[in-house]
Regions:
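A helix-centric hydrophobic-segment signal that preferentially recognizes long
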Residues: 2-203
Length: 203
């Protein structure tokens, strides 16, 4: 009888061990997947920052070129310069911005303001058709148009990756693992008027 009890206990212990191994394996696999997705979000965010930085870097040359033909449009130039300065202050603030609603909103608003200022500059440029003969301006136009398109593409890619990460960590029982190791839901770009469409820069 004691032998049967011993065998029964051994079976129970074996089942517990097997269950424990499965549980640990699942936990390790889920943790590694969360880490992988988290790194993907960071990488996509870096690409978003890079294309916004590219636009930021193009603006001084664009403004100086336009000034050569429309030097009296000081109000517009000032608006672009100020918006650029504010946008520049939101770069390189680490990926912690993705967990901070205020910081993320500040970044998004600053970039949107700069985009709006550039659109007003485009309206001014329409008054000066002779600009279209300036080779430097034409080159900047092509670069800016390409950059605006890249911004739209990289924002969409980032949103897709962030949503995939969020869905993964919110499902049970992975949500327990995510909470244990401090993985939080990521913010992403919300749909706004013009947010998913690159501004037209055809002059």
């Amino acid at each position: 009888m004691s032998k049967k009890v011993g065998i029964g206990c051994a079976i129970i212990v074996g089942i517990i061990i097997i269950f424990g191994i499965i549980l640990v394996s699942y936990g390790v696999g889920s943790y590694n997947k969360i880490v992988q997705l988290n790194e993907s979000v960071k990488e996509k965010w870096s690409q978003v920052e890079n294309v916004y930085q590219r636009r930021y870097d193009l603006i001084p040359n664009l403004v100086e070129t336009v000034k050569g033909y429309a030097s009296h449009e000081k109000e517009t130039f000032t608006a672009v310069t100020e918006a650029r300065a504010k946008a520049g202050g939101t770069f390189n603030i680490s990926d912690k911005v993705l967990n901070d609603p205020q910081m993320f909103q500040k970044f998004q608003q600053a970039q949107a303001s700069l985009g709006g200022a550039l659109q007003r500059l485009m309206v001014v440029i329409e008054k000066y058709p002779e600009l279209k003969a300036n080779q430097n301006f034409l080159s900047l136009q092509d670069q800016l148009e390409g950059t605006e398109n890249r911004i739209t593409v990289e924002r969409k890619r980032f949103n897709q990756t962030a949503r995939e990460y969020n869905i993964y960590i919110k499902r049970f029982p992975r949500v327990i693992i995510a909470n244990m190791f401090g993985f939080k839901e990521k913010l992403y770009f919300k749909s706004q008027e013009g947010a998913e469409t690159a501004p037209k820069v055809k002059f």
